[in-house]
């Protein structure tokens, strides 16, 4: 019965499975797959082209070459199906079986499987506890290994050379011990392993071991032993006796013209194995000398190695053309391998591609499709319509008609295409908006027409770009294309929720021109009653587009009634106002202003939020046409006189030249170093360039009046730049200011700037200097694209299975959000950061009532309420703290940014996050920034109040210095601004030595300066009066006189001192002697400290004793752009990483070592002190006796994310990663919502490391999924046993992708061999829960519409199971029905 069903639908048999398992194949298993043994290396007969019998293409084993025809031709046609020909032994069946039938080779001697030998860590090596080197010596016949020592003093597993073996046999007798060589010996050893006892011994050893490194090794072995026990694999299966041969159609041999053959490399590799195997058999039959047989066995081992993984060991086997042969492993690996080439990327039917051109008269949901393309793409639909209408009798006739292009065909094509969306795609598809659906409009010509507004989503322009068209065939596909992918449904960008359908370039210029207002235009002050009169006045020339007039515009009130409102405006703005949808939340004021590109985007955003999608689409289309029309009417153009070179340029340049000359002189006199001079010169020139640019912008913006008092036209270049249509201030600066500084190829800046601009023209030397940068720019762009693409791929891989799975996980945890400020400027306001997130706490109003309850999804209205109350920090839900299994919940994720509504269940938020972060990757820079000179000036050196309030000091000790200033003494102190109701509004850390301008409890206004400090040095301040004594400060050993470069005043500076052997190390410090009580305080001085007091000098409290230069004041390279983003996502340890205090406590200094010094923190709670070893060259940010808080830097630098996680927890880590990554994107002006970064960080935090096993099966130090860990603990607690303990760990995105549950997903990402080896040993099961696995096995992904199908299947399955159980209970006495038994093993039968 099944046979017949499968014949009708050959795929049916493989459809129902719900997981895939991979494991080692036993020899019996391999033989059971096989249809026969391959004995000869021959392939096909060169004269008859028929396969040789028993050869690699044998028809008897693999099946017939032609359908239903045996090899000799005795049986032909269907009627003989299933008969085996007695003459040639071939079964009569379909030739397709040659794609699925396997053969095998029986090896004359066992060989080791190279994956389990060489894929690190070597599995065979771990099981036998042998080193890989030793194993290889045995396997490749260099040394013997003792298998059973018997009563001899030899050790088991001991290696013996040939001479040693003979000696031992002479000494102890041949039969007293057994030794072997090659894979046979290893196989015996593996067979002899008792895994259960091995496991017990290892666990015992683990309990009693004392050393540091031993447990790691034991745990490694234990894991391998356990995985063999649990998976039911046998260790000896890693040694092969039988080799499977893949079906011949998968390694084809094709005759080329000219009598030659093209063949797959695998045939060569198999042939090599068969040849060596047959020769070995023959030699063994002939009883050849041992040495010859051994050599042949070694060659067989090498041949099998090459077949499985060519080049993994020894020489790579090459073919006739010196090209390495592609082995079975290479077939899977890399971009060209099976996974990425064929399973994850497929070519599709019904697609075409062509050049694109603009279609400004199209509606937003349309695209222009060339008739020729449409005819080809929609052929089957046309045939069926022709048939349905009875126009063509047969399919053949229909084909003819279409080929001849009769006029009926065009009418039918119009019908077929109506309301049938097509999908357009532009490569590279960096985010989901790279494929959108449109309704096709038939056009003449051969180019696809694209709507101008969707260009920014596709990143398309019309300089020869090509796009591909795909036709969704089934009704479901058409429905999804229309509902989900239609361009009108994708108005907002999924990355930041801002509109992506925004006018650009000409449209912006037209709208900007239209919204301009000018003084003294004709008709100024006219009163026009309505739009009709405005049109009339414009047509007769009574007013211009820019005249100030008073008119009335129709508006809608909240009840939806229309009324006329009187406004002061211009005719141009009235025209714009006509396009606005009628809604009381979108009043005329929205566009009654000068509109730049950013403003237009805001208008579209407002319209979308308040009036919905349909109105927005109509508005966008209308505003686009207006923009084009008036850009054309305005006729804006510019000539060289529009580039105004500022008059002040000459003077500014001269002034700077004099300054540079001055620095040069200081350098000649030895007052400043080369580096200092370089920094100052560059600083001076970059300031000069900026000032010239400022002057130029002033002159370009100036509005001049004509003799009649009318304003003359605005400078066209300024209009283009200011409106955001084209160009920027930086580009105008090069045209009319000065080009400024250029970089060398190495990335350093050339000291001589380019003083000319493009209008004046460059000198030869200037031109030459500017060529470096241009060339480097082009080289960088090429590298950037590849790097950015790879980052996106890693991000998608780590987050692909993160899908919204439920409405609310009910977690108690939350993230606290504050506004991000830098130097008193708000970079990202609180409102921006919490918009579209779920509240995790009640928000109290000023009246003490709940203003917004917990669990609210915050929209724009709520944000306004929060800002009005004046709250500074809000707790919200985040994907990071979500406790859903197998995904995130809708409440933790919040708003779906691309729709502006709560996120749907089934949304693939992980992939969206990855695309949102990866897509702008190409806009990031590749270079590392050189900070110094100019950049130092913007180092923050003061603190301002961000809001009105009362000042409070928290943990802040202060002292009045001799000048009467209030100085901060503590490192961890904060100033807090408190509102009238006592609520904390803002808080800031205060640096040591900062001068506080207000006292505790003062009322301050927004913008008041609270504190200021020197951004370049950290002072050492005394807390009491006394006499200073120098200790261990010896001239020319630990102390030196240096002349200050800028002022010429000499200073005493501490230098690094290495004590000679046997001498006591010097520890330079200052002590403060108090008159009555002797020594009161010690101040350790690190190298580079400048001492400000003399030996024996009397000082007052608050005196600065010494100054340490801050790291940030030095010129240093900071990684920026793409490399920085990658570094953060890969969770790499930074080069100069900061050391973080793990506990709060007091600092002490311990003993000094050769290059390190010991810093000890004594915790406040009296627990064990914690010690750190710090390089002496580093500046320690704390003095003896200082109190540090947990998480404070002991040494400045970039913190290591792993430390932050360990010391401060998940929330702090998230905050750090989000802010660091956002900073890079913000520099480039790219907006990405925080939740995307949080989603990726969540995927990096899915694992925990076991610290204490308790009664669980986990091993200490093992990394397990958080979900598994929690499930095991819940089970242990319910049984009253001791649960395991663990700490969260952070994995980089590459590592996290390789450690996902799904081995299919991991194997298709990177390191395919390693992943598959590991999975096979563990007998891993892939439950196909992620997106990637499902794409690979060819199913609907469990996200989006596929998620609904999955849910239905799960409910149906559970219902079936319940029914079956009920039936069993009822029919307990009766035998089960036979038909049912066919499907009982397939849980998916419900489908």
UniProtKB/Swiss-Prot annotation:
GO MF term list: DNA binding; DNA-directed RNA polymerase activity; magnesium ion binding; zinc ion binding
Binding, Zn(2+) 1: 70, 72, 85, 88
Function per UniProt: DNA-dependent RNA polymerase catalyzes the transcription of DNA into RNA using the four ribonucleoside triphosphates as substrates.
EC number(s) on file: 2.7.7.6
Reactions catalysed, as given in the entry: RNA(n) + a ribonucleoside 5'-triphosphate = RNA(n+1) + diphosphate
UniProt cross-references to Pfam families, sorted A to Z: RNA_pol_Rpb1_1, RNA_pol_Rpb1_2, RNA_pol_Rpb1_3, RNA_pol_Rpb1_4, RNA_pol_Rpb1_5
GO biological process: DNA-templated transcription
Subunit (UniProt): The RNAP catalytic core consists of 2 alpha, 1 beta, 1 beta' and 1 omega subunit. When a sigma factor is associated with the core the holoenzyme is formed, which can initiate transcription.
Cofactor: Mg(2+); Zn(2+)
Keywords: DNA-directed RNA polymerase, Magnesium, Metal-binding, Nucleotidyltransferase, Transcription, Transferase, Zinc
Principal EC category: transferase
Gene Ontology CC terms, in alphabetical order: DNA-directed RNA polymerase complex
Keyword Magnesium: yes
Binding annotation for Mg(2+): 461, 463, 465
Cofactor details (free text): Binds 1 Mg(2+) ion per subunit. Binds 2 Zn(2+) ions per subunit.
Stored NCBIfam families: rpoC_TIGR
Entry protein name: DNA-directed RNA polymerase subunit beta'
SUPFAM superfamilies in UniProt: beta and beta-prime subunits of DNA dependent RNA-polymerase
Record family assignment: Belongs to the RNA polymerase beta' chain family.
Gene this protein is translated from: rpoC
Binding site for Zn(2+) 2: 809, 882, 889, 892
SMART domains: RPOLA_N
């Amino acid at each position: 019965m099944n046979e017949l069903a499968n014949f009708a639908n050959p795929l049916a048999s493989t459809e129902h499975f719900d997981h895939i398992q991979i494991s080692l194949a036993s020899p019996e298993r391999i033989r059971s797959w096989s249809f026969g043994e391959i004995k000869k290396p021959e392939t096909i007969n060169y004269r008859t082209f028929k396969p040789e019998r028993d050869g690699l293409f044998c028809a008897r084993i693999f099946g017939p070459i032609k359908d239903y025809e045996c090899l000799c031709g005795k049986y032909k046609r269907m009627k003989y199906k299933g008969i085996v020909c007695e003459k040639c032994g071939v079964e009569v069946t379909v030739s397709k079986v040659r794609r699925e039938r396997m053969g095998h080779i029986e090896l004359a001697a066992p060989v080791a499987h190279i994956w389990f030998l060489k894929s690190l860590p070597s599995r065979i090596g771990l099981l036998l506890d042998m080193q890989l080197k030793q194993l290889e010596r045995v396997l490749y016949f260099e040394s013997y290994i003792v298998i059973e020592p018997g009563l001899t003093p030899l050790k088991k597993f001991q290696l013996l050379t040939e001479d040693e073996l003979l000696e031992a046999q002479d000494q102890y007798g041949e039969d007293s011990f057994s030794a072997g060589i090659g894979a046979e010996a290893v196989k015996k050893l593996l067979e002899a392993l008792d895994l259960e006892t091995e496991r017990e011994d290892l666990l015992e050893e683990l309990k009693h071991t004392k050393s540091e490194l031993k447990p790691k090794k034991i745990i490694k072995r234990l894991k391998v032993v356990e995985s063999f026990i649990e998976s039911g694999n046998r260790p000896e299966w890693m040694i092969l006796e039988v080799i499977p041969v893949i079906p011949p159609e998968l390694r084809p041999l094709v005759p080329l013209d000219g009598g030659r053959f093209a063949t797959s490399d695998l045939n060569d590799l198999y042939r090599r194995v068969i040849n060596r195997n047959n020769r070995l058999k023959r030699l063994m039959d002939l009883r050849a000398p041992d040495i010859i047989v051994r050599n042949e066995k070694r060659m067989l081992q090498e041949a099998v190695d090459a077949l499985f993984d060519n080049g993994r060991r020894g020489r790579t086997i090459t073919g006739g053309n010196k090209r390495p042969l592609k082995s079975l492993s290479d077939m899977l690996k890399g971009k060209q391998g099976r996974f990425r080439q064929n399973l994850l990327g497929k070519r599709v039917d019904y697609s075409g591609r062509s050049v694109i051109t603009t279609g400004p008269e199209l509606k937003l949901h349309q695209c222009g499709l060339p008739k020729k393309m449409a005819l080809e793409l929609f052929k089957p639909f046309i045939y069926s319509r022709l048939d349905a209408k009875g126009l063509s009798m047969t399919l053949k006739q229909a084909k003819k008609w279409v080929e001849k292009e009769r006029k009926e065909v065009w009418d039918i094509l119009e019908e077929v295409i109506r309301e049938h969306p097509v999908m357009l795609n532009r490569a590279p598809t960096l985010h989901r908006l790279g494929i959108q659906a449109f309704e096709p409009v038939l056009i003449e010509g051969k180019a696809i027409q694209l709507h101008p507004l969707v260009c920014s989503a596709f990143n398309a322009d019309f300089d020869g770009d090509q796009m591909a068209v795909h036709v969704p065939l089934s009704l479901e596909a058409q429905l999804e294309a229309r509902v989900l992918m239609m361009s009108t449904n994708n108005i907002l960008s999924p990355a930041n929720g801002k509109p992506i359908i925004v006018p650009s370039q000409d449209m912006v210029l037209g709208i900007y021109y239209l919204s301009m207002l000018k003084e003294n235009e004709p008709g100024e002050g006219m009163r026009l009653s309505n739009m009709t009169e405005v049109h009339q006045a414009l047509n007769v020339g009574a007013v211009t587009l820019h005249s100030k007039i008073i008119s009335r515009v129709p508006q809608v009130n909240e009840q939806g009634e229309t009324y006329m409102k009187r406004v002061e405006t211009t005719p141009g703005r009235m025209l714009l106002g006509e396009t606005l949808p009628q809604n009381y939340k979108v009043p005329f004021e929205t566009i009654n202003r000068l509109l730049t590109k950013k403003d237009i985007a805001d208008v579209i955003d407002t319209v979308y939020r308040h009036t919905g999608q349909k109105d927005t689409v109509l508005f966008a289309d209308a505003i686009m046409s207006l923009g084009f029309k008036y850009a054309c009417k305005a006729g804006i153009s510019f000539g060289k006189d529009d580039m105004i070179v500022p008059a002040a340029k000459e003077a500014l340049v001269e002034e700077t030249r004099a300054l540079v000359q001055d620095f040069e002189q200081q350098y000649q006199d030895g007052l400043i170093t080369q580096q200092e001079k370089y920094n100052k010169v560059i600083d001076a020139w970059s300031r000069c360039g900026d000032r010239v640019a400022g002057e130029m912008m002033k002159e370009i913006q100036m509005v001049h009046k004509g003799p009649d008092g009318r304003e003359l036209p605005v400078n066209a270049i300024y209009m283009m730049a200011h409106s955001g249509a084209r160009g920027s201030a930086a580009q105008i600066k090069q045209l009319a200011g000065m080009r400024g500084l250029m970089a060398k190829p190495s990335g350093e800046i050339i000291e001589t700037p380019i003083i000319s601009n493009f209008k004046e023209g460059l000198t030869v030397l200037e031109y030459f200097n500017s060529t470096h940068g241009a060339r480097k720019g082009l080289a960088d762009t090429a590298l950037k694209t590849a790097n950015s693409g790879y980052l996106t791929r890693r991000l998608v891989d780590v987050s692909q299975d993160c899908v919204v799975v439920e409405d609310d996980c009910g977690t108690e945890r939350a993230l606290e959000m504050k506004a991000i400020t830098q130097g008193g400027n708000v970079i990202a306001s609180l409102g921006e950061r919490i918009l579209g997130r779920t509240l995790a706490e009640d928000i109290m109003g000023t009246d003490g009532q709940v203003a917004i309850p917990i669990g609210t999804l915050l929209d724009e209205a709520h944000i306004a309420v929060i800002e009005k109350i004046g709250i500074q920090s809000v707790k919200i839900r985040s994907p990071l703290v979500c406790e859903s299994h197998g995904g995130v919940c809708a409440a933790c994720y919040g708003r779906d940014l691309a729709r502006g509504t709560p996120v749907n269940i089934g949304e693939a938020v992980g992939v969206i996050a990855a695309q949102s972060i990866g897509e702008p990757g190409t806009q990031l820079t590749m270079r590392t920034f050189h900070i110094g000179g100019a950049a130092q000036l913007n180092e923050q050196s003061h603190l301002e109040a961000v809001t009105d309030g009362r000042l409070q000091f928290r943990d802040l000790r202060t002292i009045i210095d001799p000048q009467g200033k209030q100085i901060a003494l503590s490192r961890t102190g904060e100033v807090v601004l408190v509102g009238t109701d006592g609520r904390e509004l803002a808080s800031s850390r205060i640096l040591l030595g900062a001068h506080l301008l207000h006292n505790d409890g003062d009322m301050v206004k927004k913008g008041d300066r609270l504190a200021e400090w020197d951004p370049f040095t950290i002072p050492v301040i005394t807390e009491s009066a006394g006499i200073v004594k120098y200790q261990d400060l010896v001239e020319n050993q630990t102390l030196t006189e240096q002349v200050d470069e800028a002022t010429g005043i000499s200073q005493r500076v501490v230098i690094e001192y290495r004590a000679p052997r046997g001498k006591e190390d010097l520890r330079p410090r200052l002590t403060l002697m108090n008159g009555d009580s002797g020594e009161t305080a010690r101040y350790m001085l690190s190298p580079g400290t400048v001492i400000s007091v003399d030996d024996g000098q009397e000082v007052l409290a608050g005196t600065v004793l010494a100054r340490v230069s801050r790291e940030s004041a030095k010129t240093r390279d900071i990684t920026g752009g793409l490399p920085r983003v990658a570094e953060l996502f890969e969770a790499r340890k930074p080069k100069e990483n900061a050391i973080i205090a793990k506990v709060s406590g007091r600092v002490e200094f311990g003993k000094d070592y050769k290059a390190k010094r010991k810093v000890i923190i004594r915790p406040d709670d009296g627990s064990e002190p914690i010690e750190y070893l710090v390089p002496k060259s580093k500046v320690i940010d704390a003095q003896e006796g200082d109190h540090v808080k947990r998480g404070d830097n002991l040494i400045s630098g970039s913190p290591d994310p792993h430390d932050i996680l360990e010391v401060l927890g998940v929330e702090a880590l998230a905050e750090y990663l989000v802010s660091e990554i956002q900073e890079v994107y913000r520099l480039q002006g790219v907006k990405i919502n925080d939740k995307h970064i949080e989603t990726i960080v969540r995927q990096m935090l899915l694992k925990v490391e076991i610290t204490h096993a308790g009664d669980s099966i986990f091993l200490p130090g093992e990394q397990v999924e958080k979900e598994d860990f929690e499930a095991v603990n819940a089970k242990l607690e319910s049984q009253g046993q001791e649960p395991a303990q663990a700490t969260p760990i952070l994995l980089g995105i590459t590592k996290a992708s390789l450690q996902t549950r799904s081995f299919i997903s991991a194997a298709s990402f990177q390191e395919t061999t390693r992943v598959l080896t590991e999975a096979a040993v563990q007998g891993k099961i892939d439950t196909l829960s992620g997106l990637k696995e499902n794409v690979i096995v060819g199913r609907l992904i469990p996200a989006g519409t596929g998620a609904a199908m999955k849910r239905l299947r799960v409910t149906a399955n559970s219902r079936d199971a319940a029914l079956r159980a009920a039936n069993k209970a009822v029919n307990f006495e009766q035998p089960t029905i036979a038909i049912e038994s066919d499907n009982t093993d397939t849980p998916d039968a419900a489908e």
